[in-house]
Structures are given as C-alpha cells and as structure tokens.
Design a protein with these regions (language model features):
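A structural boundary/capping signal
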Residues: 1-177
Length: 177
C-alpha cells in the first residue's frame, strides 16, 4: 500500500483491499485465486452481456450490466446473485463476515463488503462508479449519463438489490444538506 501511495506502484483498489484482508487473515489469502481470477472472469462475462444485449448504445452500459450481474441469477454469476447475508455465523468481534474476499467467494455480504465487491468488479470492467458512505452504511453511486432515472446520480443499494432515490437515502440515514 505504501508503494501505491508513494507512486512506486499503480493505484489499485483491488490490491489495497486484498492487502488489508491478507493482513487480517495472517497471509491466508491468494491474490490471483481469491481476487483476480473471479473478478476477471466476471468482467469478461459482463462484456459479453453488454454485447449480446446491444447495450453499447448506453453510456452507462457497464453500470447496467453490473447491476444485472449482482441482482439477478445468470450464467456469469453461477445463477447466484449477490445477496445480503442475514446469517449470524460470526460473533460481533469477528470481522471475517465483512471481508470482500468472502463476498466474492459465496456471493453474500454485508453493507460494507457488497458495495466494495461491486466497486472491484467495476474497476476491472472500467465502469465509473463511486463508493458512497452514510452512517454505518455504504452504497454505490454513478452519474446517470443516459437520463434513465429522474435524478442526475443513480444510487445503487447493493444490500437490497435496488435503486434508491437520494431523498430516501437522506431520510433513512437522517442526512441533511
């Protein structure tokens, strides 16, 4: 991470997330197998999905494809969309359930790991999305360059598999202007 910050290595959110999780797991994580391979495979599928559906005409085709990949069963995600993990399999002091590597592997996660996983797939695909934070929560935002939504920015609530208007996010999280 220091090399990225000092300009000695290219900036990579994927590599930074991997390094943090690798350290947390005492080195029991493989960058290629656990991060690169599944993300590259997913991005390759998304490129084909865009082409087959003729979504290239949309400036936000990559974002549309990502939402489909995360929300709906398809061959590219093994017929297993990414879902909120309601299980309580880890105690409160065990953060493994929050890890992006776990979400990539089992397609289940929390309000931290699901949006970060989306961001890593977006980075590989070249889709311009941003991580947005609310109190104790995280979601995805991207500019609506195709005017498909009533607002200039699209808020993607990965944990609920839906789009959220800005007013709803502000109301739910008690955010003011």
């Amino acid at each position: 991470i220091a090399n990225m910050l000092e300009g000695k290595a290219p900036l990579s959110i994927r590599h930074a997330v991997f390094l943090a999780e690798w350290a947390y797991l005492d080195g029991n994580l493989d960058y290629e197998k656990d991060f690169c391979e599944p993300i590259k495979k997913g991005a390759d599928y998304l490129r084909r999905l865009i082409a087959v559906n003729h979504w290239e005409k949309y400036k936000t085709a990559k974002q549309i494809a990502l939402c489909n990949f995360f929300f709906y069963p398809c061959s590219g995600n093994g017929q297993k969309p990414f879902e909120y993990d309601f299980s309580n399999e880890f105690p409160e002091d065990d953060w493994r359930y929050q890890l992006v590597s776990r979400t990539i592997k089992i397609h289940k996660g929390q309000c931290h790991s699901l949006p970060w996983t989306f961001k890593l797939y977006a980075e590989e695909l070249g889709a311009n999305v941003s991580l947005a934070h609310a109190p104790r929560h995280c979601f995805i935002m991207y500019k609506d360059e195709d005017n498909l939504f009533p607002e200039n920015w699209v808020n993607v609530e990965i944990t609920a598999q839906q789009y959220q208007p800005t007013w709803a996010i502000k109301e739910h999280f008690a955010i003011s202007d």
